[in-house]
Design a protein with these regions (language model features):
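Ligand-site clamp/hinge motif
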Residues: 217-223, 249-296, 311
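Short, well-ordered beta-strand elements
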Residues: 52-63, 103, 112-115, 134-137, ...
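A structural "hinge/loop" feature
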Residues: 62-78, 101, 149, 196-206, ...
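Ligand-binding "clamshell"
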Residues: 43-44, 294-307
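N-terminal lobe/hinge region of extracytoplasmic solute-binding protein
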Residues: 59-109, 139, 225-228
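Gly/Pro-rich hinge or "lid" segments in bacterial periplasmic/extracellular proteins
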Residues: 96, 163, 168, 172-174, ...
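Aromatic- and charge-enriched surface segment that lines or borders ligand/interaction sites
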Residues: 103-150, 186, 276
Length: 322
């Protein structure tokens, strides 16, 4: 299928396109792919017979800079991170926040948020995912030693202590996040933020495995070292060639994970991307299609071309202090 996402910003039209073969999966799975989240569980309609080989080869646009949720920056990294790691919340097919590791949540005056974690959420090594994992992850995210590109992301949620931590005035342990018990996480904000829970679909808020990081250091994301809590785990990584993920049997919703293996390719050329799809080498292209090919492909393979609106925001951060 080709997915064409038109983006109108500042009077400039942009297109994002990808292609996915319908013969691979049922409609529900296809919808999950179109949402950009392969890991999203799917309900296979009654009477639908899936293809015998449930594997997916997709272009990811470029080589990733990292698989560490606190070191990633771009869309290619986020695509894979969402398959490997699951945060408190995820996005559903319509882009709305939905339960992830947290099966429910509540708040007091939009300032103190409590997340109730699934008791069956596990890491790929079989150990349980706990509230302490999120405390460690969020503290690591804002730690200057981590140098995370998204260290300031939690500032949008106004988590207590974060401004002073990022300024080096307080230790990371003063961040307003606390494990009440293994399955209850409490987050205290410096002011009411009604939309706080919506921020938690971002990959940088996912838990990370403390034991693996402490054991392997910077090499913790390599095959054989990495421990994940999402629908997939890392099988193979050949830089500038491919990244292969395989279904994780310990994932809490594994029964509804349909695709057994996902291979990501770093194809930068949009023309090459389309050509390799049409030759049968890949099942799904990246988001960008050469605009000059859109009408031609829409005519030749209309069932494989899908058009979606693309929403994004451009903004400037002005330093008005100096």
């Amino acid at each position: 299928m080709l997915v064409n996402t038109s983006n109108y910003n500042e009077g400039v039209q942009k297109t994002m396109t990808n292609i996915t073969k319908r013969s691979l999966v049922a409609a529900g799975v296809l919808a999950a792919l179109m949402a950009g989240n392969v890991a999203l569980a799917a309900d296979v309609p009654a009477g639908v017979t899936l293809a015998e080989k449930q594997t997916l080869v997709r272009n990811n646009g470029s080589e990733v800079q990292s698989l560490d949720p606190h070191k990633i920056e771009g869309v290619p990294e986020s695509n894979i991170s969402r398959d490997l790691f699951e945060g408190l919340l995820v996005s559903d097919l319509d882009g709305h926040p939905a339960p992830g590791v947290a099966e429910s949540w509540d708040n007091k005056d939009a300032k103190v948020w409590t997340f109730h974690l699934r008791k069956d959420a596990k890491w790929s090594d079989g150990t349980p995912v706990t509230a302490q994992d999120f405390v460690y992850s969020w503290q690591r995210s804002v730690d200057p030693n981590t140098a995370s590109p998204y260290a300031s992301y939690l500032q949008y949620g106004h988590i207590a202590g974060i401004d002073e931590i990022l300024e080096g005035k307080k230790p990371i342990t003063d961040l307003g996040v606390k494990a009440i018990d293994d399955h209850t996480l409490e987050v205290t904000l410096s002011e009411p933020v009604p939309y706080f829970y919506k921020l938690l679909v971002h990959p940088s808020t996912s838990p990370v495995p403390k034991a693996a990081i402490e054991k392997f250091g910077e090499k913790w994301t390599q095959p054989g070292n990495i421990v994940t809590n999402g629908a997939y785990t890392l099988k193979d990584w050949v830089v500038n060639e491919r990244i292969v993920l395989e279904r994780s049997p310990t994932y809490w919703n594994n029964a509804k994970t349909v695709i057994n293996q996902v291979t990501y390719l770093p194809i930068a050329s949009e023309v090459t991307d389309v050509n390799r799809y049409r030759s049968g080498e890949i099942d799904m292209t990246y988001n960008n299609m050469p605009i000059e090919l859109f009408q031609k492909l829409k005519k030749e393979i209309p069932d494989e071309v899908h058009v979606d609106p693309y929403l994004c925001t451009y903004y400037y951060e002005i330093n008005n202090q100096k």
